């Protein structure tokens, strides 16, 4: 049986030490990240609150205190459809169910939202589009259940 070999590249460690220098350097660098990321996370949560909450119990989401993702839970059976609708509009999401083993969400209800890479303007636009797709997928599901 072979084991997993891990080996940090010393040159990368040296780069980090030279760049960050000490604990204060790490904290200062993380503060820069925070200043960039907090508005993006707030934009997503604001869009969800303003655009999804008035629609009733069609979605809920996490309010992370750190990390890179907001978990969005939509009506069961709708996550893949929401992701597909977003993709048709040019918005790429982390795959539906990606937080589950083998990407198999038994409820098909979870989307992992990562507002860390795009600009704030892009996050705001993407959040609005995502909300429209959640509403559309929900309406499609409800109409299919009534038929």
Predicted regions and their residues:
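PLP-dependent class I/II
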Residues: 1, 6-147
